[in-house]
């Protein structure tokens, strides 16, 4: 059984080494909640550098590109070893989507088999996570992989509230006498790793394909997302 498992790993590794993966790190200069967050210091390094270094250490990533409208972000990213592309203003304003930035990057580089999106706000996602997600892609013969983590609290304990705060019907009857540990596990997107076949991504304009998409499960600690000053 161990021999079969090792052969499978070798086959996966061999297949993936023949595929090309373009890692894209989108980093706008403007951030409403936390200005300049992508280059704020985190343990002695700019926030974005954690994602750049993780991608560069990956066994499978062919090229790492930072897309930004901001010269300082681009200069810092280049110093940490990433290729850079200047994003035009219309693709970096509040109405522009992440896909707009991805499409702009794809159009300006040679063709790659897969796109790997790495948000710079996930500094604890490292090369091990990236490589495991890519290996899962081949293991599942998937078109797309998206990272998730287990939720801190079950959504079954939550609900909306009316203006007067009335809690009638707040919880479903079937969970009223259940312990938390007896409830099904729920998972949430953690924003750390998105992978998709390039053709499928361009066709669907999203990593969330209708079929043949699987979750890569990460631990909650590695899923930390930097969004506000308190997160630092």
Question: Where in this protein do the model-derived segments appear?
Answer:
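Catalytic donor-sugar/metal-binding loop of nucleotide-sugar-dependent glycosyltransferases
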Residues: 205-216, 221-223
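A conserved hydrophobic position in a structured secondary element of the catalytic/binding core
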Residues: 68-69, 125, 195-197, 218, ...
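Conserved core of the sugar-phosphate nucleotidyltransferase
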Residues: 95-100, 114, 123-211
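Short phosphate-binding loop-to-helix
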Residues: 65, 71-116, 124-128, 132
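A residue-level structural signature of the nucleotidyltransferase/glycosyltransferase Rossmann-like core
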Residues: 122, 193, 215, 223-224
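N-terminal glycine-rich phosphate-binding loop and ensuing alpha1 helix
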Residues: 20-67
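N-terminal amphipathic/basic-hydrophobic helices that include classical n-h-c signal peptides
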Residues: 1-16
